[in-house]
Amino acid sequence: MAYKIEFAESVQSHFRVLTVRDRAIVLDAITRQLTREPLKETRHRKPLRPNPIAPWELRIGPLRVFYEVAGGETRVVRVLAVGRKSRNTVTIGRREVRL
């Protein structure tokens, strides 16, 4: 059974900073990678150490999608942030977050 994808309200402002091409790449990756087994660690998905953003990360080249999964019967993946990573800093919207 597939997971439902939900976006936090703040993600809309994160998408505005990305190019149209990057938005399409991110949305395609979210659909392909997170609708089935979002809690399975793969080459592109990994659980994160405790941080201020989210418990899971989806890597798409230099782009990052941070998300959490609501277990149980709801089966919902909630995308909390989308940004671009450069070394140990992620730019989310217009804000830089140090990881």
Features from the language model and the residues they span:
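A broad, low-specificity signal marking well-ordered, structured residues that form hydrophobic/aromatic
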Residues: I5, K46, V77
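Short aromatic/basic micro-patch
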Residues: I5-E6, E57
